[in-house]
Amino acid sequence: MVPKPHAKSAKKALRKKKVHLKFNVECKNPVEDGILRIEDLEAFLNEKIKVNGKTGHLAANNVKVEVAKSKVSVVSEVPFSKRYLKYLTKKYLKRNSLRDWLRVVAVNKNTYEVRYFHINDGEDAGSDHE
């Protein structure tokens, strides 16, 4: 006969660890220049973020989108991908025709920054000059 597991150990196996994740999207330069509106980005993220395959259920799943002066923060207590946040930010830029001038760059472990593309002044920097 196989012994049954104790009730306490079964409960421990079912209990899940709470995950506290916070990801930021820093948009300082584009917001100061008036190219990007931070409120529009927040509304877009609130509308488009999917949790468990459904949009519009952020509050029920403990996911919050917060706005500071030039920063959007996504705070989640359920598993949430930083890469998904980058995907949605790029989608927002494309939808507003800003993707040609702005890019999304990872600054550190939990922060993205929206930056301008750096375009070199010299077209052929490596060619021979006559």
Curated annotation (Swiss-Prot):
MF (Gene Ontology): RNA binding; structural constituent of ribosome
Database matches in InterPro entries: Ribosomal_eL22, Ribosomal_eL22_sf
Keywords, in A-Z order: Ribonucleoprotein, Ribosomal protein
Record-linked Gene3D superfamilies: 3.30.1360.210
Gene Ontology BP annotations: cytoplasmic translation
Cellular component terms (Gene Ontology): ribonucleoprotein complex; ribosome
Xref: Pfam families: Ribosomal_L22e
The keyword Ribosomal protein appears for this protein: yes
Similarity remark: Belongs to the eukaryotic ribosomal protein eL22 family.
Stated name of the protein: Large ribosomal subunit protein eL22
Organism of derivation: Caenorhabditis elegans
Gene for this chain: rpl-22
